[in-house]
């Protein structure tokens, strides 16, 4: 099985990969879902502060690859017969190293400017998003403290998401085809 890791700052367009996954019938496992699940398990409301604090605490308690371990266990238990599995939302170079140590992994980074991402997040209707600039900046700083910048800069592939949606999806699909050797 080959893992396809998706990384990018919040609002960059990572979730667009699910549309391609449906088209190519590839499973998507979201690392963010693991953190949101752990936040809910603690009885906390899903908002940027609680979800962010949960991610920090999980890494403090279980190490810097704390989110990758349960994700990979889940993938190995449920999807070991699949050719490809997408892991969406890789945040840490430690997670990348852990996954590469235990599986074949290619990482696709999706990049958008802070202004573009803020506009997208402000229009999204997810509880852990913010439409306040200061909260947005705090979230970015927290993400960067997880070493997401290293993951993005060391990714195997990069897709920029600043233009229109169709151009982005075409670029993403072309990159995706390279990763799964369809081209």
Curated annotation (Swiss-Prot):
It holds the Pfam family AAA_17. GO terms for molecular function: ATP binding. Gene3D superfamilies: P-loop containing nucleotide triphosphate hydrolases (3.40.50.300). Keywords: ATP-binding, Nucleotide-binding. The keyword Nucleotide-binding applies. ATP binds at residues 8-15. It comes from the Archaea. HAMAP family: UPF0200. Belongs to the UPF0200 family. This is UPF0200 protein MmarC6_1392.
């Amino acid at each position: 099985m080959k893992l396809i890791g998706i990384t990018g700052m919040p609002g960059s367009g990572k979730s667009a990969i699910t549309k391609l996954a449906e088209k190519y019938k590839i499973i998507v496992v979201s690392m963010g879902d693991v953190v949101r699940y752990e936040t809910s398990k603690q009885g906390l409301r899903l908002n940027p502060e609680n979800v962010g604090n949960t991610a920090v605490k999980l890494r403090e308690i279980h190490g810097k690859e704390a989110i990758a371990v349960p994700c990979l266990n889940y993938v190995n238990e449920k999807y070991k017969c699949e050719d490809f599995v997408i892991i969406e939302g890789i945040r840490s170079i430690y997670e990348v190293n852990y996954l590469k140590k235990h599986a074949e992994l290619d990482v696709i980074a999706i990049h958008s400017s802070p202004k573009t991402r803020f506009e997208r997040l402000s229009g999204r209707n997810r509880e852990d998003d913010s439409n306040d600039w200061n909260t947005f900046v705090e979230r970015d700083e927290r993400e960067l403290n997880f070493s997401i910048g290293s993951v993005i800069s060391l990714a195997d592939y990069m897709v920029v998401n600043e233009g229109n949606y169709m151009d982005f999806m075409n670029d993403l699909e072309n990159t995706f085809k390279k990763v799964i050797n369809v081209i």
